[in-house]
């Protein structure tokens, strides 16, 4: 399976700064740190942050998934524009309890997004909790209060440095959402009904397009399947 590969977790001073499937994420984070240092050298702002140890560790997918369930927002260290950080925060809210996570940490900026993602499925697909987390790009852009800027939001999604924990894989094309909704409606019309029938139909339908993913379309599909099979999450 695609998820069976090794995952690289990059930490700075203990905080998670990147998760990917190869060590290029370490180079990317190191480059961002070097850029910030060059900016500070050229222009003192009075808000300089001194970073300590940066390290990368190869782990299995189960450990990444465990981190996804355990970490809080303040356990992350994000580098990017304010807009990108807003989008990443909104992605985080798709799978995490906003009320229990506190505010946006200092290194994310102080102009965070307002509101939270509801769990009633009204903007998503219907069906079980996992499938309700799936959302199309235009609806997610609206959650980011930027429906007219779908491309900009999609670009920020693609630059997400912390895969799985910040679940960018849950944003899929509208055609995929429509297909899943059709499957759900058909399942509800049978005498069996229930989420199990709906999930089974979704997992077996290879025609559903879950869209592009920086780590590969096959891996994106497996991550979504994992979401649907882990009902307790």
Listing of model-derived features with the role each one plays in the protein:
Residues 1-147, 186-193, 199, 203-204, ...:
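Basic nucleic-acid-binding alpha-helical/helix-turn surface characteristic of O6-alkylguanine DNA
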Residues 146-218, 222:
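Short glycine/serine-rich loop segments
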